[in-house]
Curated annotation (Swiss-Prot):
Physiological role: This protein is located at the 30S-50S ribosomal subunit interface and may play a role in the structure and function of the aminoacyl-tRNA binding site.
InterPro entries reported in the protein's UniProt record: Ribosomal_bL19, Ribosomal_bL19_CS, Ribosomal_bL19_sf, Translation_prot_SH3-like_sf
GO terms, biological process: translation
Keyword Glycosyltransferase: no
Annotated protein name in UniProt: Large ribosomal subunit protein bL19
Family: Belongs to the bacterial ribosomal protein bL19 family.
Source organism phylogeny: Bacteria, Bacillati, Bacillota, Clostridia, Moorellales
GO molecular function, one term: structural constituent of ribosome
Length: 113
């Protein structure tokens, strides 16, 4: 194992729950406003994960007041307070980019039993 891999391994978080694309997650993010720090919750559907190790990211999509918002979160970021899995969705794709074209009920994902 080289030096870079050793340093990256120390930075990896161990408190990350098991979640996949299609799952609905609630991400608690630390937001700094001026000299204050608060927790902001972003809840939505995971539409993709990419990368490995310290560079791994995941994309969460939600529709708020008719406007779709997608945020990309680094999985091992110290800004993430915690990730809660709200429900597990049943999908057959690794990337759910097709949901961007779907509106309303067509954008729903079946719940895994």
């Amino acid at each position: 194992m080289n030096i870079i891999e050793t340093l990256e391994k120390e930075q990896l978080r161990t408190d990350i729950p098991d979640f996949r694309p299609g799952d609905t997650v609630r991400v608690h993010v630390k937001v700094v406003e001026g000299n204050r720090e608060r927790i902001q919750i972003f809840e939505g559907v995971v539409i993709g994960r990419r990368g490995r190790g310290i560079n791994e990211t995941f994309t969460v999509r939600r529709v708020s007041y008719g406007v779709a918002v997608e945020r990309i979160f680094p999985l091992h970021s110290p800004r993430l307070e915690r990730i809660e899995v709200v429900r597990h969705g049943k999908v057959r794709r690794a990337k759910l980019y097709y949901l961007r074209e779907r509106v309303g009920k067509a954008a729903r994902i079946k719940e895994e039993r």
